[in-house]
């Protein structure tokens, strides 16, 4: 048995050794250095470009998907690479990819001040060209009719030109002469808005 004095001495010794909860500071958990994160991202970018050069699109797609998961990667700078990969790996997903980009980076300066050169006004013409390449003329025409009513799209000459070309293409598919004439008149109107004179 310990004597009372010995127990008191041991308690006082433990108190002197134990950290004071009021003065103790919990050390921060060490996180990976930003330097290492940057290296990993650079390595993934290099791998993705190498796979694209070798036309290894499935592996390039995996590298791109890993880059998308990183918070420090700005997708608006890599959107065209992502579109190229999707067109090779999963063409059906390309339209959804472009629609999400347009929704994520709206062409409204009050909302999207950080991306003046990478917003929906920049992505939308590429989306229309994608639909034209796939011969989805009706869908492209419907989108243009909707967006050309809104600024800043109605001030984009390229979109008016695309609309004019689509009107000519849709006029070819019309059996009715009156409907064909309507499409041709609409094409002339859009070309004039694009600053192009068309003689028919």
From Swiss-Prot:
InterPro entries: RNA_pol_I-specific_init_factor (IPR053029), TIF_Rrn11 (IPR007224), TPR-like_helical_dom_sf (IPR011990). Subunit of a multiprotein complex essential for the initiation of rDNA transcription by RNA polymerase I. Binding to the DNA template is dependent on the initial binding of other factors. GO terms for molecular function: RNA polymerase I core promoter sequence-specific DNA binding; RNA polymerase I general transcription initiation factor activity; TBP-class protein binding. Keywords: Nucleus, Transcription, Transcription regulation. GO terms for cellular component: cell division site; cytosol; mitotic spindle; nucleus; RNA polymerase I core factor complex; RNA polymerase I transcription regulator complex. It is found in: Nucleus. Its main location: nucleus. It comes from the Eukaryota. Signal peptide: none annotated. It holds the Pfam family Rrn11. The lineage of its organism: Eukaryota, Fungi, Dikarya, Ascomycota, Taphrinomycotina. One of its GO terms (biological process) is transcription initiation at RNA polymerase I promoter. This is RNA polymerase I-specific transcription initiation factor rrn11.
């Amino acid at each position: 048995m310990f004597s009372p004095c010995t127990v008191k001495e041991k308690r006082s010794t433990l108190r002197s050794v134990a950290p004071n909860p009021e003065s103790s500071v919990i050390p921060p958990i060490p996180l990976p250095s930003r330097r290492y994160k940057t290296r990993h991202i650079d390595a993934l970018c290099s791998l993705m470009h190498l796979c694209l050069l070798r036309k290894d699109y499935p592996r390039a797609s995996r590298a791109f998907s890993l880059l998308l998961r990183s918070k420090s990667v700005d997708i608006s700078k890599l959107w065209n690479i992502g579109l190229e990969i999707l067109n090779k790996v999963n063409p059906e997903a390309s339209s959804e990819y472009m629609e999400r980009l347009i929704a994520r980076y709206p062409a409204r300066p009050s909302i999207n001040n950080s991306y003046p050169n990478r917003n929906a006004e920049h992505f939308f013409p590429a989306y229309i060209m994608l639909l034209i390449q796939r011969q989805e003329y009706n869908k492209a025409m419907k989108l243009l009719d909707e967006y050309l009513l809104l600024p800043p799209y109605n001030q984009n000459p390229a979109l008016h030109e695309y609309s004019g070309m689509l009107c000519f293409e849709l006029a070819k598919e019309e059996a009715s002469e009156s409907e064909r004439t309507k499409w041709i008149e609409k094409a002339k109107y859009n070309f004039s808005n694009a600053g192009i004179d068309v003689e028919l």
